[in-house]
C-alpha cells in the first residue's frame, strides 16, 4: 500500500468477508456441491456402462463433471470477492477514508503481478485483479464523497519498521547511510535508521537519534517504545525503564509499551513489578498468546509457581491445547504456599475445562451414533 487509505481498503475488504459470512456460506455451498458432484459422476458412470462400458467416454464424462464442480466453486468464490469489494468500499467511506483507495490498490496489485498470471483466464481466477474489477470498484466509489488520501505519521513509521524487519542487513546499511548524512532527515527515515542501528547491535547510536525525536513528537508510542528498547539494549537500564514508565503514564495500558516495559523489568531483576503490570494488562485487555506466556514467566521469576503454572495453562488454552492446560492447572494446585483465593481460582478453571471436554466428548459420541 502507498498510503493509509489503501491499507484501510484491505482491512475493509477482509472485514466485509466476515460481516457477509462468506466462510460459513462457502462451507454450506461446498457441502451441497459435493452431493451434486457425486451424483453427476455416478450418473456419468451409469450412462457409460449403459452405453457399452466405453472407458474413454466414461473418463471424459467424469472429467467434465469434476471440471463443472471446480468451476462452480470458482464462480462462488469470485462472487464473494466482488461482494466484499462493494461492502468494503462502503466501510471505507464511512470510516472517513478515500473510497477510491481500493481501486488504486487493485491497480498497484495488477502492476505487481505483471505477466505472472497472464496465462490464467479471468473466469478461472478466484481473486481476479482485472480491469473489470477495478472499474466496478471505481463505479462503486463514485457513489461516495471523494476524500484525499492521507498518510499519518504512524503509518510512515510502521512502514519503516516493516522495511527494517524484512530487509537484509547489508542492504539496510546502504539505505540509511545517505539518510544519516542528510540535513534534517524525515522523521520516518530517522526512525528507520535508529531501528537499523539496533538491528546491527549499535543501540547507543540509536539512542542518540531517538531521544530528540521523542522530545519533538511526545504523542507517538512507537518512538517511546524504540527509545526505551534502545536504552535497555545499550545497558542504560535506569533510563530505559524511566522512558517506559513515562510513556505508560501518558498511554496507560498500551500493550506494546507494557510488554516492553515488563521485559525491561524482568531483565533488571524486578520480576514482581513486571508480574503486577502484566496481570493488570491480562485482566483488562484481551491478551495474545506471547503476552500470556510472558505473564507466566514473570510469575515464575517472582517466585509465584502457582500463578506461573496457571498462566501457562491459559497460554495452552489460547493455543487450543486443553489437555496441556489441564496438566498445568493440576501442577498449579499442587504448588506450595497457595492462598485460599488461588486454590479456588485454579480449581474453578480446572472444573470449567473438564466440563467443556466432557460435553465435547458427549457431542462427538452422539454425532457418531
PLM regions with names:
Residues 179, 212-213, 246-247, 280-281, ...:
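Canonical positions in the second alpha-helix
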Residues 2-5, 15-32, 50:
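Catalytic Zn2+-binding segment of zinc metalloproteases
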Residues 1-9, 76-79:
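Short pre-active-site segment immediately N-terminal to the catalytic Zn-binding motif
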Residues 301, 318-369:
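Terminal, low-structured helical/coil segments at or just beyond the last alpha-helical repeat
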Residues 70-243, 253, 272, 321, ...:
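Extracytoplasmic and endomembrane cell-envelope/extracellular-matrix remodeling and assembly machinery
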Residues 193, 227, 261, 295-298, ...:
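Structural register within alpha-helical repeat arrays
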Amino acid at each position: 500500500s502507498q498510503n493509509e487509505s489503501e491499507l484501510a481498503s484491505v482491512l475493509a475488504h477482509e472485514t466485509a468477508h466476515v460481516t457477509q459470512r462468506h466462510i460459513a456460506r462457502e462451507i454450506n455451498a461446498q457441502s451441497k456441491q459435493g452431493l451434486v458432484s457425486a451424483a453427476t459422476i455416478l450418473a456419468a458412470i451409469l450412462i457409460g456402462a449403459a452405453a457399452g462400458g466405453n472407458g474413454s467416454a466414461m473418463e471424459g464424462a467424469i472429467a467434465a463433471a469434476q471440471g463443472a464442480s471446480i468451476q462452480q466453486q470458482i464462480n462462488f468464490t469470485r462472487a464473494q470477492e466482488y461482494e466484499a469489494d462493494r461492502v468494503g468500499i462502503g466501510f471505507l467511506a464511512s470510516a472517513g477514508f478515500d473510497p477510491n483507495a481500493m481501486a488504486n490498490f487493485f491497480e498497484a496489485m495488477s502492476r505487481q503481478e505483471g505477466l505472472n498470471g497472464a496465462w490464467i483466464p479471468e473466469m478461472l481466477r478466484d481473486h481476479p485483479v482485472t480491469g473489470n474489477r477495478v472499474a466496478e470498484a471505481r463505479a462503486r466509489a463514485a457513489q461516495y464523497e471523494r476524500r484525499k488520501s492521507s498518510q499519518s505519521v504512524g503509518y510512515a513509521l510502521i512502514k519503516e519498521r516493516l522495511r527494517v524487519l524484512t530487509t537484509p542487513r547489508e542492504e539496510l546499511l546502504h539505505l540509511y547511510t545517505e539518510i544519516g548524512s542528510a540535513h534534517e532527515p524525515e522523521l520516518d527515515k530517522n526512525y528507520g535508521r535508529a531501528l537499523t542501528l539496533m538491528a546491527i547491535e549499535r543501540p547507543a547510536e540509536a539512542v542518540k537519534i531517538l531521544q530528540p525525536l521523542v522530545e519533538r513528537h511526545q504523542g507517538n508510542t512507537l518512538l517511546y517504545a524504540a527509545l526505551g528498547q534502545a536504552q535497555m539494549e545499550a545497558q542504560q537500564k535506569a533510563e530505559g525503564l524511566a522512558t517506559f514508565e513515562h510513556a505508560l503514564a501518558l498511554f496507560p495500558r498500551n500493550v506494546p509499551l507494557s510488554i516492553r516495559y515488563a521485559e525491561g523489568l524482568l531483565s533488571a531483576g524486578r520480576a514482581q513489578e513486571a508480574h503486577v503490570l502484566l496481570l493488570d494488562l491480562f485482566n483488562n485487555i484481551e491478551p495474545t498468546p506471547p503476552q500470556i506466556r510472558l505473564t507466566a514467566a514473570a510469575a515464575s521469576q517472582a517466585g509465584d509457581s502457582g500463578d506461573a503454572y496457571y498462566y501457562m495453562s491459559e497460554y495452552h488454552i489460547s493455543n487450543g491445547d486443553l489437555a496441556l492446560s489441564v496438566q498445568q492447572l493440576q501442577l498449579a494446585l499442587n504448588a506450595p504456599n497457595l492462598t485460599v483465593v488461588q486454590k479456588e481460582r485454579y480449581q474453578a478453571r480446572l472444573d470449567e475445562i473438564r466440563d467443556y471436554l466432557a460435553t465435547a466428548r458427549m457431542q462427538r459420541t452422539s454425532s457418531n451414533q
